[in-house]
């Protein structure tokens, strides 16, 4: 009988290298927020990939960056603390970019870690194959990796091969989650992340990191309909105007796009109510950060 493998794998890397895209690809559902704006992942989002012979729990850590406020401090602590909890580390980089100071900082952080470390070169669909080997040699000059795998999370290229390699390094173990469970976050959290993703896609550079989303109420009204009441928090009146848009058009579009994804997630019709409120300087208010769902694990 084939042994069953299971383990926890941390995905670490600079902002916007494709970590969330990878999680959504291997899980087959939208769990992690995807956006072209940096630093969009705020909580450790655990996606559970279950196969007949293995179960892998992926922890999508916030992108490494220099913190600018209390929320940023929190995001960095989550990323670093994750390294002590896992069976393997995926260090993901954008192969279409030069090695940056952020990459060097992460490799310095990883040098003393005993856990198996895989260098995952993402976005190979954007580069010529001839450029891969020089890039691999560059990274190898910084540190030794357990293995180096080029992939495209967006296109799915080489992803299955990487999963097979990863499985071979994981210990024998049980299924930690039921077959049909794809995340350890409550549905309310995933819903709030979907809404935040749509806002990021539809608003300008000024807005992204000033956005907080809280699901105030989520109730099943009947067998085929869920009512969701949500508050979107911004830091300034001008940002509130941008999110709402002229005549409420922007907010309406956010609701329309979010509802579509939420209905797929829940398998029910959704009535989605969105409110926008100003909470000045909320990213520096620790209690408020906790209130809207960014909570550190307690030992």
UniProtKB/Swiss-Prot annotation:
Residues 13-20 are annotated as: G1. Residues 39-43 are annotated as: G2. GO terms for molecular function: GTP binding; GTPase activity; ribosomal small subunit binding; small ribosomal subunit rRNA binding. Gene3D superfamilies: 3.30.300.20, P-loop containing nucleotide triphosphate hydrolases (3.40.50.300). It is a peripheral membrane protein. Residues 5-172 form the Era-type G domain. Residues 203-280 form the KH type-2 domain. GO terms for cellular component: cytosol; plasma membrane. Keywords: Cell membrane, Cytoplasm, GTP-binding, Membrane, Nucleotide-binding, Ribosome biogenesis, RNA-binding, rRNA-binding. Residues 60-63 are annotated as: G3. Its main location: cytoplasm. GO terms for biological process: ribosomal small subunit assembly. Residues 122-125 are annotated as: G4. Pfam families: KH_2, MMR_HSR1. GTP binds at residues 13-20, 60-64, 122-125. NCBIfam families: era, PRK00089.1, small_GTP. An essential GTPase that binds both GDP and GTP, with rapid nucleotide exchange. Plays a role in 16S rRNA processing and 30S ribosomal subunit biogenesis and possibly also in cell cycle regulation and energy metabolism. This is GTPase Era. It comes from Staphylococcus epidermidis (strain ATCC 35984 / DSM 28319 / BCRC 17069 / CCUG 31568 / BM 3577 / RP62A). The gene is era.
